[in-house]
Amino acid sequence: MSSPLEQALAVMVATFHKYSGQEGDKFKLSKGEMKELLHKELPSFVGEKVDEEGLKKLMGDLDENSDQQVDFQEYAVFLALITIMCNDFFQGSPARS
């Protein structure tokens, strides 16, 4: 049986591949695929509607090789940044102080 961390890693990989390749390269997320992933998989972070301007900025920030898509490595950086943000939030919460 796999550990919770191993399960979490498997979910992160499976989630990427669930959305990648619907619009072209099966190993990259297009802007539309990234938008759908954010809306369906991270609704607490984006709210009910994904902000187009925010999505454009996010894609630009993540897209290190400027191919207008997010590859797995760029996606992993995105997840790491979200994880750091969550950790910072919980470290600052009154229950942890």
UniProtKB/Swiss-Prot annotation:
Database matches in Gene3D superfamilies: EF-hand
Disulphide-bridged cysteine pairs: none
Keywords, alphabetical: Calcium, Metal-binding, Repeat
One GO-annotated biological process of the protein: endothelial cell migration
CDD domains xrefs: S-100 (cd00213)
Domain of life: Eukaryota
GO MF terms held by the record: calcium ion binding; calcium-dependent protein binding; transition metal ion binding
Domain EF-hand residue range list: 12-47, 50-85
Residue sites binding Ca(2+) 2 per the record: 63, 65, 67, 69, 74
Residues annotated for Ca(2+) 1 binding in this entry: 28, 33
Functional summary from the UniProt entry: May function as calcium sensor and modulator, contributing to cellular calcium signaling. May function by interacting with other proteins, such as TPR-containing proteins, and indirectly play a role in many physiological processes. May also play a role in suppressing tumor cell growth.
Subunit structure: Homodimer. Interacts with FKBP4. Interacts with PPP5C (via TPR repeats); the interaction is calcium-dependent and modulates PPP5C activity. Interacts with TPPP; this interaction inhibits TPPP dimerization.
PANTHER family cross-referenced by the UniProt entry: PROTEIN S100-A2, S100 CALCIUM-BINDING PROTEIN
Leftover remarks: This protein binds two calcium ions.
UniProt protein name: Protein S100-A2
